[in-house]
């Protein structure tokens, strides 16, 4: 027994168009076969969701369903009502709800023209490239307008003809009793025209697939996850329709030395125990390639931060520049020689509370705490 369409979508019987669309969108994204490859249960659920939405979004079909239930669409009822998802099924639903990849509707015109699909290209760049910016050359396989037929899909010297089934409307109406249902024309798939003599090069599609070389400008300061849109560089439209867009999704590779937080950079630099105690300096190479000296005052503690103003990342399309923060990591000596050990032991004997105020004060406070706790 078929499940109730309202229960399938998880909505109340009085749900409005907005609630239906929201419920369908959520469930369709969850159970779409592309997200669940090989899962036949999800594929079956996906078909149920589509059937339910296809019925309830149409006022006439919904009225019939509310009155007669599933019987309205069985043989002898409303012939062909909500059954199947060929013409006017999956494609029409997802064109209505989701549009193409980036949300632009793939629209048909009365002349059979369709907007081309948007394309996605993933690009990985280094932090240095994100810092300086670059112009990248990419090769993208995509459909382009057929030069043989100029995108019409018809054999040169011929023209598309008006569809004999829908007479150019792209829709056909089926009447059963007092019910009337309008569906996408199965002969022209809603285009209103058919091609009697298709172009031999593109097989009537009006476009062919080729690999194109494109130049992509990546501005300085670009961040990980940024999307760049190249208008009209996506798939060519069908039969002379407008092209889709190309979206470049950028990923900035992790750096060996620098971590990024917005426009600021962070770097951890190891220094020796003697440099931390006696003071000194070290040099760091910043992303612009320059050497910058960092002075270490005597008595520098582990984790101390030094700020190099204006040595971070440029802010995208602004004159501002972030800062570079250097954090010291005091390295404890290992594999000591006998003489080194003797010197450190001698240093320990000569040390006072003034040399290590934090550790000395900490242990003194800890001792006092437990002594006072024991007296209670």
UniProtKB/Swiss-Prot annotation:
Tell me how the cofactor is bound. Binds 2 Zn(2+) ions per monomer.
Where is Zn(2+) 1 bound in this sequence?
Answer: 146, 149, 199, 202
- The answer to whether keyword Cytoplasm applies is yes
What does this protein's UniProt record list under function? Participates actively in the response to hyperosmotic and heat shock by preventing the aggregation of stress-denatured proteins and by disaggregating proteins, also in an autonomous, DnaK-independent fashion. Unfolded proteins bind initially to DnaJ; upon interaction with the DnaJ-bound protein, DnaK hydrolyzes its bound ATP, resulting in the formation of a stable complex. GrpE releases ADP from DnaK; ATP binding to DnaK triggers the release of the substrate protein, thus completing the reaction cycle.
Q: Which InterPro entries match?
A: DnaJ (IPR012724), DnaJ_C (IPR002939), DnaJ_domain (IPR001623), DnaJ_domain_CS (IPR018253), HSP40/DnaJ_pept-bd (IPR008971), HSP_DnaJ_Cys-rich_dom (IPR001305), HSP_DnaJ_Cys-rich_dom_sf (IPR036410), J_dom_sf (IPR036869)
The UniProt entry, under NCBIfam families, shows:
DnaJ_bact, PRK10767.1
Q: How does it assemble?
A: Homodimer.
Organism name: Mesorhizobium japonicum (strain LMG 29417 / CECT 9101 / MAFF 303099)
Q: What is this protein called?
A: Chaperone protein DnaJ
Q: Which cofactor does it need?
A: Zn(2+)
So which domain of life are we looking at? Bacteria
What's the family?
Belongs to the DnaJ family.
* Compartment(s) of residence: Cytoplasm
CXXCXGXG motif repeat feature ranges: 146-153, 163-170, 185-192, 199-206
- Which gene name belongs to this protein? dnaJ
Q: Is RNA-binding included in the keywords of this UniProt record?
A: no
One Pfam family linked to the record: DnaJ_CXXCXGXG
Residue span(s) of domain J:
4-69
Cellular component (GO) terms are:
cytoplasm
Zinc finger (CR-type) residue ranges?
Answer: 133-211
GO MF annotation terms: ATP binding; heat shock protein binding; unfolded protein binding; zinc ion binding
Notes on the domains: The J domain is necessary and sufficient to stimulate DnaK ATPase activity. Zinc center 1 plays an important role in the autonomous, DnaK-independent chaperone activity of DnaJ. Zinc center 2 is essential for interaction with DnaK and for DnaJ activity.
């Amino acid at each position: 027994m078929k499940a109730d369409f309202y229960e399938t979508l998880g909505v109340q019987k009085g749900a409005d168009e907005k609630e239906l669309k929201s419920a369908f969108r959520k469930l369709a994204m969850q159970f779409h076969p592309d997200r669940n490859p090989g899962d036949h249960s999800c594929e079956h659920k996906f078909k149920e969701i589509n059937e339910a939405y296809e019925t309830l979004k149409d006022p006439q079909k919904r009225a019939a369903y509310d009155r007669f239930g599933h019987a309205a669409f069985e043989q002898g009822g409303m012939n062909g009502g909500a059954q199947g998802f060929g013409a006017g099924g999956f494609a029409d639903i997802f064109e209505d709800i989701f549009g193409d990849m980036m949300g632009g509707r793939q629209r048909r015109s009365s002349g059979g023209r369709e907007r081309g699909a948007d394309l996605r290209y993933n690009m990985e760049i280094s932090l240095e490239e994100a810092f300086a910016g670059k112009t990248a050359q990419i090769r993208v396989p995509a459909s382009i307008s057929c030069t043989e037929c100029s995108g019409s899909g018809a054999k040169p010297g011929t023209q598309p003809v008006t569809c004999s089934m829908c007479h150019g409307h792209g829709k056909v109406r089926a009447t059963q009793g007092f019910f009337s249902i309008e569906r996408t024309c199965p002969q022209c798939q809603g285009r209103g025209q058919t091609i009697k003599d298709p172009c031999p090069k593109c097989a009537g599609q009006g476009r062919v697939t080729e690999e194109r070389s494109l130049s992509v400008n990546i501005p300085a300061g670009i961040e990980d996850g940024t999307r760049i849109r190249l208008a009209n560089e996506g798939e060519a439209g069908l039969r002379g329709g407008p092209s889709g867009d190309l979206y470049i999704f950028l990923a900035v590779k992790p750096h060996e030395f620098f971590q990024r937080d917005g426009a600021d950079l962070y770097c951890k630099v190891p220094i020796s125990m003697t440099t931390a105690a006696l003071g000194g300096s070290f040099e760091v190479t910043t992303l612009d390639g320059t050497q910058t000296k960092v002075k270490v005052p005597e008595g520098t503690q582990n984790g101390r931060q030094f700020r190099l103003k204006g040595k971070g990342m440029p802010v995208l399309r602004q004159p501002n520049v972030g800062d570079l923060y250097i954090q010291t990591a005091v390295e404890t000596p290992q594999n000591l020689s006998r003489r080194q050990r003797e010197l450190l032991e001698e240093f320990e004997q000569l040390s006072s509370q003034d040399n290590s105020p934090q550790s000395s004060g900490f242990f003194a406070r800890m001792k006092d705490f437990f002594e006072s706790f024991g007296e209670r």
